UniProtKB/Swiss-Prot annotation:
GO terms for biological process: proteasome-mediated ubiquitin-dependent protein catabolic process; regulation of protein catabolic process; ubiquitin-dependent protein catabolic process. This is Probable 26S proteasome regulatory subunit rpn3. It comes from the Eukaryota. Residues 248-428 form the PCI domain. The lineage of its organism: Eukaryota, Fungi, Dikarya, Ascomycota, Taphrinomycotina. GO terms for cellular component: nucleus; proteasome regulatory particle, lid subcomplex. Residues 470-483 have a biased composition (Basic and acidic residues). The 26S proteasome is composed of a core protease, known as the 20S proteasome, capped at one or both ends by the 19S regulatory complex (RC). The RC is composed of at least 18 different subunits in two subcomplexes, the base and the lid, which form the portions proximal and distal to the 20S proteolytic core, respectively. InterPro entries: 26S_Psome_reg_C (IPR013586), CSN3 (IPR050756), PCI_dom (IPR000717), WH_DNA-bd_sf (IPR036390).
Length: 497
């Protein structure tokens, strides 16, 4: 009996193991990676659901995977999608098939997708497929063909008036400006973008409005039209509910405009905000390179030295070498090293569009060198100052020393008769208001970060109503208990005192 029971237990354990192994095998079989066509079909189904429910969040979920899908697309998949969703219009279908060099089959038996109102395709699905085709043309470097094609797409997009098209339209306008930039025709887009921005503001299309605003600033900065960009910023407002990528681009463009206008403190705040909000992914490396380059120059113009950890980041180490040389020259106040670095990396600085700002650093280098001389020597001749700073004459050294004293760079005096500079005793910085101001700036930043974090949180809909109902229920229950207490006659008579 005992042996039989043991055999039964062993058999039951083996059966359970077989069942578990069968389940794991079944799970491994079901976990099959989806094809590109299935991913596109899933996004299209989500777009159709978003159209019926009028929920823009479903559109956002569909667009999140679009960039990954686009790099996996090929002509066969696009041809299947075009034949399926544009079977109602042979002329449009043939035009789209020509763009991807796909042969046209006359006997196509694909069924068209209707939206239930007599139309043959949802506008959201139509624009999504046009977006996929535009991205494919761009990544295949067919810029001239793509520029002419996307003009027709934009004209077709403007014929629709759907709130659910907001995020797809923003993507289309982004590739619209990219195509024309590659063809050196971005000036042609300016009037179109201005009219689109006005229309988006009237319709309250937040994503399109934010995207077009950043594209206009990009266009103005590309042609050095900083005054027009500043007027555009002053007459418009950036919506807070726009996506994070648009917000950091807007902050970067604002920082660039303010730096050109000599407002380095405001530019520094915008650039720090862009760096902190930027995603730490591979796709954001080039954007971070541009932001860090401008941020380093702005810091140097403010009289600050960038931290060395910025130049030691693996993804930015090679591209920031020219700016490291400039920072080292500014830190030690070596005008000769600064001039050598400026001439050696002039091509890189002009390509980044920062050559003008870096040329302004010459005065900063001279001031830094003058400050170090003042701290090192209690008394030094103007001729030695001229030699150490690499100036042309003693008159130039005397002028620079006098200007440094007037601007508060150094605390010294000039003996014109004997031609020397005498430094005064250094004052304790903790006796001034500078530590208090620095501490105040840090507190302000922490408070602003706390407020932004609270604003970015998502709260459940009508949560306050449930709290009010709970308070009302508690109040009714308390009133009922008080009424029952008044009707209670079981208390003993206290009598007379």
């Amino acid at each position: 009996m005992i042996d039989d029971q043991r055999d039964m237990q062993v058999d039951s354990v083996n059966q359970e193991e077989n069942v578990d192994s069968g389940e794991t095998k079944q799970n491994t079989v079901t976990e099959v990676p989806r094809t590109v066509l299935q991913d596109v079909e899933a996004n299209i189904a989500a777009l159709m659901q978003a159209t019926k429910q009028r929920d823009p969040r479903l559109v956002y979920r569909s667009l999140r995977t679009t960039s990954n899908i686009c790099h996996r697309l090929n002509a066969d998949v696009l041809g299947q999608l075009i034949k399926k969703y544009y079977s109602f219009d042979n002329s449009l279908k043939n035009e789209l098939l020509e763009l991807i060099d796909m042969p046209q089959n006359g006997d196509d038996s694909s069924t068209s997708i209707t939206n239930g109102n007599g139309n043959t395709i949802f506008p959201e699905v139509d624009m999504y497929l046009q977006l996929l085709l535009s991205m494919t043309l761009y990544y295949n470097e067919k810029y001239e063909v793509g520029a002419e094609y996307i003009k027709k797409v934009i004209a077709r997009l403007q014929s629709y008036d759907r709130r659910t098209l907001d995020q797809i339209a923003a993507k289309l306008y982004f590739y619209y400006i990219l195509f024309f930039e590659k063809c050196n025709r971005s000036v042609e887009c300016r009037n179109t973008l201005l009219s689109v921005h006005r229309t988006a503001s009237l319709r309250h299309d937040s994503e399109t409005q934010a995207m077009v605003l950043t594209l206009l600033l990009r266009n103005y900065i590309q042609f050095n039209l900083y005054d027009q960009a500043d007027r555009l910023v002053s007459k418009t407002s950036f919506l807070t509910n726009a996506s994070n990528n648009l917000a950091i681009r807007y902050q970067y463009y604002l920082g660039r405009i303010r730096a050109i206008q000599l407002d380095y403190t405001t530019a520094h705040e915008h650039l720090v905000s862009a760096i902190r909000k930027a995603p730490n992914t591979v796709y954001a490396v080039q954007f971070l390179e541009a932001v860090y380059k401008l941020h380093i120059v702005v810091q140097l113009l403010m009289g600050e030295i960038p931290e060395r950890r910025i130049f030691r980041q693996k993804s930015l180490e090679k591209t920031l070498v020219p700016y490291l040389r400039i920072s080292q020259a500014v830190r030690i106040g070596d005008l000769c090293a600064f001039t050598d670095a400026l001439s050696k990396y002039e091509a890189e600085f002009r390509f980044d569009g920062l050559y003008t700002l870096i040329c302004r650093l010459r005065h900063t280098v001279i001031k830094t060198g003058l400050r170090m001389i003042s701290l090192s020597y209690s008394r030094i001749s103007l001729r030695d100052v001229c030699i150490k700073l690499g100036l042309d004459s003693e008159e130039s050294a005397e002028y620079i020393v006098a200007k440094g004293i007037r601007d508060g760079v150094i605390d010294a005096s000039i003996d014109h008769s004997n031609a020397f500079m005498a430094s005064n005793e250094a004052m304790d910085i903790y006796s001034t208001e500078q530590p208090q101001q620095a501490f105040h700036e840090r507190i302000q930043f922490c408070l602003a970060l706390h407020n932004d974090s609270i604003k970015s949180m998502r709260y459940p809909m009508d949560a306050h109503k449930s709290e009010l109902e709970g308070v009302e229920e508690a109040r009714r229950r308390m009133d009922k208990e008080m009424a029952e207490a008044d009707l209670d006659d079981d208390e003993p008579d206290l009598g007379e005192f």
